[in-house]
Amino acid sequence: MQLEIVSPEKTIFSGEAKSVHLPGSEGHFQVLNNHAPIVSTLKKGKILIDGVDNNPESDLLNFSNGKASLEINSGVVEMKKNKLIILVD
């Protein structure tokens, strides 16, 4: 799936991912390739991304062995047409 993580200041990540684990307001959930359309709010926690290449342009993500993580305070996520957009604070 195409993944885009955006903050008010800049685009944190843009690229392909196999799966994304998110801290939803009502509990953690995972989004996989070709997931059904969804819109959800996010609470403070960690976004875990699997199946990514190291992206030297992203100084906010922590990379290790094809995985990445990002601590957030809150956000909103939308999955539509195999593109996951995460707006974070």
Regions found by a protein language model. Name each.
Residues 2-89:
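Compact, glycine-rich, soluble single-domain proteins
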